[in-house]
Amino acid sequence: MKKNLIISNVRGSKDITPECMHIWNYVETKIIKIVDSYNYKEIRFPIMEFAKLFSKAIGDDNIVVNKEMYIFLDKNKHELALRPEGTAGCVRSCIFNKLLKNNITRLWYMGPMFRYERPQKGRQRQFSQLGIEIFGSDSYSAEFELISISNRIWKSLNINKHVYLELNSIGNLQERQTYQIELKKFLLIHEDKIKKFFLNDITKNPIKIFNTNNKYIKNLLKQAPKIIDSIGINSRNTFFYLCDILKNLKIPYKINPFLFRGLDYYNDIVFEWMSKEINNTKIAICSGGRYDNLVKNMGGIYTPAVGCAIGLERLIMLVSSLSKEIKKKSSIDICIIPINIKIEKEVLIFSEKLRDIFSYKLRIKVDNSQKNFKKKLKDADKLGSKIVIILGENEIKNKQITIKNLSTRKQYTLYIDDAIEKIKKIFTKNIQ
């Protein structure tokens, strides 16, 4: 084992250090506030499940299951997997806990997912997603609601001009089978050229070819038959009803006839929010779609459903690159600096009294380091502290404290009760 291997990141994973957490907290808070306003409830479920759950939900021949999942045996020889996506685990939890009743159920969740992929910018082996799911609605209003929520999230983060919405309808299972026959005919005509760049069997699951990044094949596929021509009147009408309401509410979109989601449980409407701001390549920030048969396929009662997931690392990369004005939130509001160690006990008692008065609404730090006073003052300034409270033996003896406002550089020595009133005035907005 290499000397430093034990403290290195596992390839494809990243630490989020305290100086980066402010933007994560900022983004997550914005998202949760909007999702909550639509009356979605948070659900939490394990990051590991029985591996069969994902092969049942996603399909044994899907690349996520047969190549990208982290699978291991526990001590009882049970085959477990780290979750590669959230929908399957959410559905399992809903069935197990009997959450899916006759009414519409709205849920959201957030946490790490795991896929063994080649790490690159915007793609990691451990990545975070925020998932939003609606169970029990067969109306296009459910798709619209998820698109509307995500659109409001982009606006709240000031990135709405840097993302765009792509839509498609992939029809029901029977309609997709009809389309695959037409697509297969087209691909077999060009089989010799395709085989140079695409090693998979194009006759087995021809739709998978739309996942390729090869430029030659992508250009060739522009001539391929479109699935919209193979879907029935009901699927077509539902799709265009959604397009119509998006137009009415001025949410721009683009119909992408070759948009197919990578997971096999989707049917009818699928969508992706894309951006070209990361890596100068087209990359999905949010993906979603309808999966009416998944709950029943996993052992529950038939429950139509729609969901989407936001890739948080990608979203945060985008927000960070575009919103330079998002400043690091002040680490502390008040820094208490004792002049010497002799009064440490009195300082700690005072700091706890201050926390009681402000009911945890202010962030208060006691600097009990061995640094000299000037360095402590400098550190408080670096941390963005608004005020410094200076306590020495004289202050303790006279029941006074010295307040230094680091914004105005003004300094006051006041009796404790007067000083607390002064602090309240300085932090009026924080403590309301």
UniProtKB/Swiss-Prot annotation:
Listed Pfam families: HGTP_anticodon, tRNA-synt_His
Keyword hit for Acetylation: no
GO BP annotations, alphabetical order: histidyl-tRNA aminoacylation
UniProt-listed InterPro entries: aa-tRNA-synth_II, aa-tRNA-synth_II/BPL/LPL, Anticodon-bd, Anticodon-bd_dom_sf, His-tRNA-ligase, HisRS-like_core, HisRS/HisZ
Enzyme class label: ligase
Subcellular location as annotated: Cytoplasm
A cellular component term, taken from the record's GO annotations: cytoplasm
Key words of the record: Aminoacyl-tRNA synthetase, ATP-binding, Cytoplasm, Ligase, Nucleotide-binding, Protein biosynthesis
EC numbers on record: 6.1.1.21
Transferase listed as a keyword: no
GO molecular function: ATP binding; histidine-tRNA ligase activity
CDD domains associated with the record: HisRS-like_core
Catalytic activity: tRNA(His) + L-histidine + ATP = L-histidyl-tRNA(His) + AMP + diphosphate + H(+)
Quaternary context: Homodimer.
Entry similarity comment: Belongs to the class-II aminoacyl-tRNA synthetase family.
The name this protein goes by in its record: Histidine--tRNA ligase
Species of the source: Wigglesworthia glossinidia brevipalpis
